[in-house]
Amino acid sequence: MSDVTPRSRSLFQVSVAVAVIGVLAAALLNALHYVQEKAERTVMEATVRNMGKGLEIELQTRVIRGRPGSSRELVGANPIQWLESPPEGYVGSCGRERAPGEWCFDVASHEVVYRPRLTASLEFRTAGRRELRWRVGSADETAGGQGANPMATGAIGLVSTTSFVWH
């Protein structure tokens, strides 16, 4: 005779079902975290791209108004001013500590700062960094900083001052 009772068979089936559900839940949570990080990266990249486009519009506006020489005044400016509305999490001038998901403008370094919420796929090339930074600068002053600079000599653009890779 078999020692397996209907009750022990039922407990075994429930145990297997719970284990399968646990594995599936873990996989789904991992996938959700991955998607959330990719969404954060996409929003951050769109915000930076929009700041760059806003700068280009400001530069062209100055040319149209006959003031192309005044473009140099934009070096070190806060590019958030050229967005229709500030990004979610923008707090103005940077404080001492920055919360994850916070954007601010560092008045001392003239850089826009973003502290990512999720960083599992983000690799900072400088040890101890936890934030991303950009600056309105000229090709002349930034050429030595981050490797190959796509801007023409004397051109003004939005450049990253943080060396990072977001996989």
Q: For each predicted feature, which ranges?
A:
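Intrinsically disordered, low-complexity regions enriched in Pro/Ser/Thr/Gly and acidic residues
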Residues: 79-167
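Membrane-proximal N-terminal amphipathic helix
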Residues: 38-65
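N-terminal single-pass transmembrane signal-anchor helix
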Residues: 1-36
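Short, glycine/small-hydrophobic-rich surface segments
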Residues: 55-90
